[in-house]
Amino acid sequence: MKIGIIGAGAAGMVAAINVANENNEVFILEHTSKIGSKIRISGNGKCNLTNESVSKEKYNNQDFADVVLNEFSVNDTKQFFYNCGLMLKDKNGYYYPMSEQAASVIDVLQSELYKRNVKLITDFHITRMHRKDDKFIIKGNNKEIIADKLIIATGGKSAAKTGSDGSGYSYAKMFGHNIIEQV
């Protein structure tokens, strides 16, 4: 199966690592020139990966948060990075890479993508997407790429200079999804 992922941030790379196996051909499309741009600046460049105080009570939609946190817990997050070869440092319940450098996180994620033969395509600017005969057709950079499954992992509008410019909302709309406006 050919699986396409739009966005090479933390969510896109982790999704690719989780679905890449001998049965799946996985590619990531990133519209900037670098992967993990927002990771590089998170935690003032130290990249806080998770913390022990994560709970559903800290979210507006507690039912949804409960489902998500039960599916992939703080311990699951720590184990994921350990399995990728990243040693973590606990600072009062907040977890950082041992190096305290966000670049370490990007390096281990990129290494895992390479081990799993995930194809990274940077500077790819999507102009159109649609679904035809159970396939996803993605057009951009004078190319057409076809996928059996598609994951949109573009982030929100939090940091346009890193690539989180809200483009994922328009991509989701192309497939008929409703977008709930931010408050």
Question: What are these language model-derived features?
Answer:
Residues 2-28:
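N-terminal Rossmann-like FAD-binding beta1-loop-alpha1 element of flavoenzymes
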Residues 65-73, 92-111, 157-164:
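Short beta-strand to alpha-helix junction loop
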Residues 44-92:
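Glycine-rich active-site loop/strand segments that organize a redox cofactor
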Residues 12-14, 35-38:
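Short N-terminal binding/cap micro-motifs at the start of the first secondary-structure element
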Residues 6, 41, 152-153:
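Redox-cofactor binding/interface segments in oxidoreductases and associated redox assembly factors
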Residues 5, 9-10, 34, 156-158:
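Residue-level detector of alpha-helix initiation sites
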Residues 104, 114-183:
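Predominantly flavin-linked oxidoreductase catalytic cores and closely associated redox partners
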Residues 81, 109, 172:
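Residue-level signal for inorganic ion chemistry
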